[in-house]
Amino acid sequence: MKYGNLMMTKKKLLIGMVTISGIVILGSCGKTETVNELLIVDQCNDVRDLCRLELANAQVSRYTNFLGKTIKRLQSQTPLRDIQGTVTWNASAGTSLADNSDVQSELGLSCQDDNCTANSNSTAYTLPVGSNTISVSGTVTVDGKTIDLATDVPALVINTSAAGSSVHVFPTELEGNLTLQDLVDSLNQGRHYAHATFSADGSNLKIQCDPGYVWLDDINPEYGGQSSAASARSVAMVSWVEELEEFRVDEFRFLHFDMSSLTLNGVRLGNHVFWEMGCWPT
């Protein structure tokens, strides 16, 4: 009996050693090579809505494992100077070439010849919230080799976050029998569409954005005014009907499902006063 147990133990150890040896052998069955590639290198601010872009000569190591998966690691990069040929930058809709003074003040850098253009290397773009694709095209000669940039240089995807905060306070100048608490209660009926909670902050109206949502810093309408953002989001919308001295929410509920770029803070249209508010996804 003891002999049988001993043989089983030896067999398990042998299987374990074979398995471990197999893993070591498979793990070593890979190939590593170092190559030079042209890449787009970006330097951006915190929310990535301003990015400087440069075409660089990069040294990249490629490791291909036994499963055929390739892992790339950037070893070094050198900006291309005195390019022979033409570089043309291509950016997705909504982007625009940046002002070099903004690049200097925010990033401490500059575009080529202090001018950010579609043909300079480096250049810079201002980017809208969301996913932005930057690519490069043209034909250049590097170290005697002619390169088709559109084919050989992979596009770069930059995800831009909304610049904002989780809380915003609106001034109010409510009149008649309209109370701040009534306004808060009415807006909170649509809080799930606004992705926020409304409350009173002294005599002002406060919006607290849900996690994953922000209020854009540059959207700050005075009472009776409105602001328009570059991007839309879902909103809560209510109106105060003066002759009835009551809020109406349901008749405007269809607007909750619309994507609106407007923010209304007590905008008067005839005998109605409107509020339209909602936070933006980060």
UniProtKB/Swiss-Prot annotation:
What name is this protein filed under?
Bacterial lipoprotein FTN_1103
Domain of life of the source: Bacteria
The entry's function note states: Stimulates the host immune inflammatory signaling system allowing the host to combat the bacteria. Stimulates mouse interleukin-6 (Il6) production.
InterPro entries of this UniProt entry?
DUF3281
Q: How does it sit in the membrane?
A: Lipid-anchor
Could you tell me what induces this protein? During infection of mouse bone marrow-derived macrophages (BMDM) expression decreases when the bacteria is expected to be in the phagosome. Disruption of genes for cas9 or either of its associated tracrRNA or scaRNA increases transcript levels about 100-fold both in culture and in mouse BMDM.
Signal as a keyword of this entry, yes or no, is yes
What keywords were assigned to this record?
Cell membrane, Lipoprotein, Membrane, Palmitate, Signal, Virulence
Positions of S-diacylglycerol cysteine lipidation: 29
Q: Which residues form the lipid moiety-binding region (N-palmitoyl cysteine)?
A: 29
